[in-house]
Amino acid sequence: MHDSRETFVNHAFVTGYPVKHSRSPLIHGHWLKQFGIRGSYRAHEVTPEAFPDFMRQIKEGRTDFCGGNVTIPHKEAAFRLADRPDELSAELGAANTLWLENGKIRATNTDGRGFVANLDERAKGWDRISAAVILGAGGASRAVIQAIRDRGVKTIHVVNRTPERARELADRFGTAVHAHSMAALPEVVSGAGLFVNTTSLGMDGEPAPAIDFSGLAPDAVVTDIVYVPLKTPLLRQAEEQGFRIVDGLGMLLHQAVPGFEKWFGLRPVVDETLRQIIISDMDRHA
């Protein structure tokens, strides 16, 4: 197998455990068809025990893959096993995008870029803020914190049920990040221009606790990285309280762009056609 920029017909993957639920093949399949590219992108389920060998197979050319995406639970292992992880993935300790270059596996993390690109598209001017509130301190919150910090947000409040987890993120990302327990939520939302839910609250339509957003800045944006359902209970609450909302689907779509460009040589565009393809698939599986 040749490296991605040398191969006429390239094949890419998404791997996780499980991975059959992934909508990434729909996204990349749409772009391959749109560009008329001879290539493929397919789901390839790998257990945690088998993942190191899978990475070796890619590097040694024992698969037809030029690279691919990595999802739960392999992101941290992908970072550790890659030959050349970049600075973004190094700070996060996790990678979601891999590609072969000169016989080495390179790695990056595009989750944060996907997050801010979604806001850029659907809430223009969102970054003219001084403070943001992040609900949750899991792996997903790391990429969000990194991305909004790098866009210039000076104060980032991380609120979590377990304050120790939030403090770990404050230690990781420096003085811009402040850790809080859930009890501090009413205080830290005061004047904030962005509220981000990175937890599973409201996923699959489950009830979410009531949150009073009234302390947010008048033009604040409330967003959720969950996209099933598209309008989560948390987003409904924020909308009813008069705030701009952004669903999480765009993050999924935009984070896919850099990988496609690496593997297939063309930069795709996230548009309404692609968004509707994914929404239709979500409706079919509701």
Curated annotation (Swiss-Prot):
UniProt xrefs under InterPro entries: Aminoacid_DH-like_N_sf, NAD(P)-bd_dom_sf, SDH_C, Shikimate_DH, Shikimate_DH-bd_N, Shikimate_DH_fam, Shikm_DH/Glu-tRNA_Rdtase
Residues of the active site: 75
Highest taxon listed in the record's lineage: Bacteria
Residues bound to NADP(+): 87, 136-140, 160-165, 225, 248
Keyword DNA-binding: no
Binding-site residues, shikimate: 22-24, 71, 96, 111, 227
Top-level enzyme category: oxidoreductase
GO biological process, alphabetically ordered: amino acid biosynthetic process; aromatic amino acid family biosynthetic process; chorismate biosynthetic process; shikimate metabolic process
Subunit structure: Homodimer.
HAMAP family: Shikimate_DH_AroE (MF_00222)
Cited NCBIfam families: aroE (TIGR00507), PRK00258.1-4 (NF001312)
Family assignment from sequence similarity: Belongs to the shikimate dehydrogenase family.
Protein name: Shikimate dehydrogenase (NADP(+))
